[in-house]
């Protein structure tokens, strides 16, 4: 199978010029090097020194509250084994891990929870054993979102939405947008009796085209309620896109969409 269209440096620079992406914080900038203080990142690197550059990481500079902060990230080139997102100042630093295939260029958007102002980190692990790192500082006006009841509101439990391009040229990438109604209960919010409410999370998302893996995501406590994902698909032929959302209780929700290549 052909590799997906590579995200080139030109593409990343174009995103940055449009205000849709930002490079890693320069050495000496406030918050720079935040990743070195995250044990989970050190464990993933296993002694490899990551390189700055090659990742376009975009979040707002200021968020009025941390309940739902938009995040987009794209990695230059191909051969991305996994893309990890961390919010080091959250109670659980790991936010999400994204997995790409030859059918999906390494670009994704979602919404995350930030419990306070901090530097968000993106770590890309590549097939050749190297790693890329990027950081973005975000100021949160109202902190403590992970214990705010409004963080968990969801009126449409397990209801899904999917949007795909009408048609795609063979091998050309196009966006898939999907979401599911779910409170993403973290286990940190106190209930009426003061005891923490039980954790209840959508922990895994998978997309496949006629049975062939396209894209997957591991989701953790810091993904916003009603999880939203926008990823890319670059099919060679028409087929049925199958989407699966898996809750940590074992409950599974499925959805489908037709991908037309012509």
Model-predicted segments: where are they?
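Aromatic sugar-binding surface patches on proteins
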Residues: 103-108, 222-230
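N-terminal secretory signal peptides and thylakoid transit peptides that target proteins
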Residues: 2-19
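Structural beta-strand segments of beta-rich domains
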Residues: 67-71, 172-176
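N-terminal edge beta-strand
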Residues: 45-64, 154-169
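Short beta-strand edge segments in extracellular beta-sheet folds
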Residues: 137-143, 258-262
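C-terminal segment of N-terminal export signals and the immediately downstream linker at the start
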Residues: 24-53, 160
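Short amphipathic, basic-aromatic surface patches that mediate peripheral association
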Residues: 180-196
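Short acidic/polar inter-strand loop motif in beta-rich domains
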Residues: 127-133, 247-254
């Amino acid at each position: 199978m052909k590799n997906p269209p590579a995200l080139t440096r030109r593409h990343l620079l174009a995103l940055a010029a449009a205000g849709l992406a930002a490079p890693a914080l320069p050495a000496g900038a406030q918050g720079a090097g935040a990743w070195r203080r995250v044990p989970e990142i050190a464990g993933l690197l296993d002694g490899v020194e990551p390189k700055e550059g090659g990742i376009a990481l975009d979040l707002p500079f200021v968020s009025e509250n941390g309940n739902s902060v938009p995040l987009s990230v794209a990695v230059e080139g191909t051969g991305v084994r996994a893309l990890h997102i961390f919010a080091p100042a959250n109670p659980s630093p790991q936010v999400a891990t994204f997995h790409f295939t030859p059918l999906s260029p390494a670009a994704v958007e979602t919404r995350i929870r930030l419990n306070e102002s901090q530097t968000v980190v993106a770590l890309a692990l590549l097939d050749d054993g190297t790693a890329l790192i990027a950081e973005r500082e975000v100021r949160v006006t109202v902190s403590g979102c992970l214990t705010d009841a409004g963080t968990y509101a969801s009126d449409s439990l397990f209801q899904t939405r999917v949007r795909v391009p009408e048609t795609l040229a063979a091998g050309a990438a196009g966006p898939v947008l999907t979401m599911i109604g779910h409170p993403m209960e973290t286990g940190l919010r106190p209930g009426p009796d003061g005891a923490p409410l039980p954790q209840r999370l959508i922990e895994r998302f998978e997309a496949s085209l006629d049975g062939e893996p396209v894209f997957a995501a591991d989701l953790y406590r810091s993904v916003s309620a009603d999880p939203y994902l926008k990823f890319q698909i670059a099919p060679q032929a028409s087929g049925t896109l199958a989407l699966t959302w898996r809750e940590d209780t074992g409950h599974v929700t499925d959805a489908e969409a037709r991908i037309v290549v012509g």
